[in-house]
Every structure is written in C-alpha cells, then in structure tokens.
Amino acid sequence: MNKIRFLDKYLVQKIAAGESIDRPCSILRELLDNSIDSGATKIEVFLEEGGIQKILIIDNGSGISKEDLKICYLPHTTSKISSEEDLRKIETLGFRGEALSSIAICSNISITSSTTSNESYQIEVENGIEKCFKKQPAINGTIVDVTKIFHNFPARKRFLKQEPIETKMCLKVLEEKIITHPEINFEINLNQKLRKIYFKESLIDRVQNVYGNVIENNKFRVLKKEHDNIKIEIFLAPDNFSKKSKRHIKTFVNRRPIDQKDLLEAITNGHSRILSPGNFPICYLFLEINPEYIDFNVHPQKKEVRFYNLPFLFKLISDNINNFFDKNINNYQDIIIKRQLTEDDHLIEMTNQPENFNKINTYDIPQNNNLETEDVNEPNKNTTQSNIDLRRYNSIIQNRPTLRENIGNIFSDNFLEFEEPPNKNEKEEIKFNYIGQIFSEFLIVEKINEIYFIDQHAVHEKIIYEKLRNSKKNVQKLLVPIEFTVVDKNIEEIIDSEIEEYKQMDIIISKIGPKKYQLESIPNICSQYENTLINFFQSRRSRTINSLESDLYATIACRKAVKRNDMLSAEFSKFLINEFFKLEIKHCPHGRKIYYKISKFELEKKVDRA
C-alpha cells in the first residue's frame, strides 16, 4: 500500500490559505491591496471587534466585471500578471492570485462590484464554495464584506488575540497603506464609529499627519535623491529625537512595507555619528526602484524583497544620510523641546572655588609614546586616587611646555596642518562665562540664562575630527614601508575588499603574503600616526557603520584629544568652549552626546524658586 498520496483539493487550499492568511489584519492587507491596485481614489474601511467579526471594504476603483466576478475567488486567478515575463517587472501590490481564494476558504465573503454605471453583481462564497450569484443595483466600484473569520479553522481562531490587540494590528496595516498612498482618501470606522479620515495630500503632509506626534509635532526634514533606476525619499527627525528601539525606522519599497534587515542597518549607519550607542533614529525611507531590479516573489505576505545590487543600495542610503547631517549640522536650527527634569535628575553641586582655581587647572599635553593605547575613559584601577592627584600635579611642574606651546603642538603645520587658534583680536569671539572644570572631566559654562556641562574629551575629539575632515591633504611616501600582519581570515578579507578605498584616501597598502601587508604611503595628516593606522587595520573585524575616512579620522581624533582626568587651563578650556559654540557641536564622532544643559528656570524650579 502506498504511503504517499495526493491530498484532497480542499485540504490543499486550506493549507495554502494558512500560509498567507494568519489573522484578520492579513485579510485587511490583501483587500486593501486589491482596492489600491484597482485605481481607487477613496477607500472606506469598517472593522468590528478588531476584524474578528467583520471586515468591510468599499472603494471607488475600476470594479470587477460579471465574468471575472464568477472566478475571482478561485485559486491562482488574477488580472495582474499573465506570463513569466510579467513576474520579472511587478508593478502591482498583488500578483499571486491567492488572496481572495485564501480568504474565501477561511471565512464567508461577499463581493459586490460593477464596471459600468448600469448594474452590478454580487457573489457570496462560503468555505471556498459559491453559494449565491445575483444582480444588484449599480454601484461605483467594489464592496467586499468578510465575516465568520476562521470559523472552520478552530485551531487558528483559538490563537487570535483579544479585540484591542487585533484592532491594533489592523490599524498598523492601515497605517502602512495610508502612508504610502497619500493620493487616496481613507475613511476608518471601528465598531460602527468613525475613527479618522485622511484626505488626499502630498507625501510629506501625509507623513507629518500620521507620524508627526512621534516627534512632538516638529517638522520632519526631507532628503531626496535620484540615481539611475532608484529614487530615494527619506523623512528624518530632528537630531534631538531618538528611540531605544528600531520601531520607528520604517522602510517602503515601491509602496510596500518591507522588513529588510539590510535597509534598517543602512539607516542606522547613516545616523551613527549623531546617535549614541543604544539609541535608534526616527526615520521613514521610501524607495522607488525599477521593478526589473527587485524580486518581491520571496515571502507569502511580500514583507521581504531581493535587490539586484544590495551593497550599492546600502551605501547609497547610508552615505546620503551621513552627508545630509554633515551639510546641515551648522545651518539647521533644531527646535529644542525644553526637557523637564525628573526627580531622578541630579544637579552637580558646585562649591565656591578659590581665587586661583583657574590658575591651578592647567593642561599638559601627553608626551609619551603610548598615545595609541592610552585608555580614554578609565585611569589605572590599581592606582589610588591620591596617587592620581599627585601624579597630575607633578606633571604640571616638571618640565611642562607652556600653554602656548601646547596649543601650537595641537594645531601646528607639522601636526595635521591645522591653523593655530587665532589670537583674541582675530578669532570669532562668542560671549559666554566660563565657570570652571569639575571632576577633571567636564567644563561648566554659563550662556544666556543656561548652564552647559561639556565633556572635555568629546568636544576636543570632535574639534580635531572636523579639522581632519576639512584639512588639505597631500600624499607622503614612507621611506621604509611598515609591514604588519592580521590575526584571522575575516580581517584579511575585509582589508582586501577595502584596499581600493584606501587608495582614494592616499593610503597605499600592498599585500605581500597570506595575512601580511605593508603600508607604503599615507596622507600627510597621518604622518605621526602610523601605529594608529596599523592598529586600525588590524582591528577591522567587520565593515563599520561610517565611511573608512570617517572611521579613521574618528580613531585619530580620539587618540589625540584630551582625556578624562586631564587638568585644563582656563585659556585652553575657553578655546574648546568657543569652538563648541562656533561649530554648534552636539555629538562626538562616535555619536555620544557632548553636553548637557539646564536653563535658569529649570534650576530655579528644582530648588522651588520658580
């Protein structure tokens, strides 16, 4: 007796229905896709009990003819493709011919439609079987009424959530369709009550209308780019808005919501220099790509897509977002929302400082040869605090270069070709009141009824980073090439893939053997940092989020900047603060916030004076 047998046709249809229809929101998605594909300019949606009891869709689209209505619920019937060639350039939301047949198998469905103004027809289907077909008064478009969802799928029905959760899932589907089709009027009704009407509008107005509350009704910034067969439109939140999850990163490809890890990473990467680790951007990406270069025939619900050239697309998105923030960092005025302090916020308690406070706070440029490996954040844990203090003050009096020499060392021609900070008569003075340095880590500044607590390492790091990026660069060939090796195959593959990019940065690397390379030429701005470069190459365990150039400059800036526990002179501190305000610095090259500020009013409120 044969163990392998043909399945019953009805059973096959039930299995297929279970793949594409798993809950009411799946039915809603398929019906909305059909309405949109029909060219509708108005869609009315009625949901009862989260779609569990009833889903009713009314549209003014092109309608379904009498002949097509008789077969539209059968498996693999569709008006959207007719050949394999059509599958290679899909321009509609639906194309498989599975939606209506799957819905008809797991529920009762009634479809009333017309293609003329004279008459319409209605078909009623239960459990995939036609029960009624009749003539009806003329309507403009199509009405689809779905009831008794999963009545013949008891296991599936048991796993449905409570009404509020199913409603929320349906609203999420509606949101995806509303946001991607601003040219359509949508009317949403829940449990026979009007919930919301969205009128025809531009995409930017629709995004602002739907998602504006996420950024407290501030305005999104819009980035538009076109490249060959790709159009990109990205809606970016102001810099001061971020989230602790990726929930507000949404990607749409040819008006479809797509869950694509690579696109999410590209967006996150583009924001990397303005967001600290653990924070994610608020961003909505809309891609329009020639259908011949993408494949939607991957996932039953079309939530995934294959791209013809994903690495190029990844770089295009990431680099454009990065460049957008670079260009706007100095001229875009953020709308700052006044942050109300919570009871958990702590103000740094300031004590009266002695008159010679600023005179004691001098900064000694590190002169050791271990600059590349110096710990940025923590002193040696085995060293007591008293030893740290003693060593710090000893460094001030033992053969210390003058402050003027120190500043000259940082910004002289032989270091990164930085101009020396202009003197007081030449430089752009910004009015502020420097209060002092605390914890050997933060600079405190008063400016226009606000107090700033500025991270000294982060602000100096950002200043150096910006100077590096904007400085004139010349190639410098090493008299003796520096050989180095890498520890594993993964790093070797990454360096091999990046060699051409290094050449564009005037960094010439040659491979001289398995896992062995030699550094032959470098830009003049890196002339003192060969060891930093080598360490940078040897730590490339993955392609990082920024461009190679940004990664490298961030590494050099981090090594060169003043550190925590460095004592700074008043003059040098004021120089950093002036640059901080002049450049409107907000984040370090790694995305961490550089400062915290509190207004006079907030401070007075904290001590019950307001």
Curated annotation (Swiss-Prot):
Annotated Gene Ontology cellular component terms: mismatch repair complex
SUPFAM superfamilies from the UniProt entry: ATPase domain of HSP90 chaperone/DNA topoisomerase II/histidine kinase, DNA mismatch repair protein MutL, Ribosomal protein S5 domain 2-like
Alphabetic keyword roster: DNA damage, DNA repair
UniProt cross-references to HAMAP family, sorted A to Z: DNA_mis_repair
Function statement: This protein is involved in the repair of mismatches in DNA. It is required for dam-dependent methyl-directed DNA mismatch repair. May act as a 'molecular matchmaker', a protein that promotes the formation of a stable complex between two or more DNA-binding proteins in an ATP-dependent manner without itself being part of a final effector complex.
Entry's family note: Belongs to the DNA mismatch repair MutL/HexB family.
Protein name, per record: DNA mismatch repair protein MutL
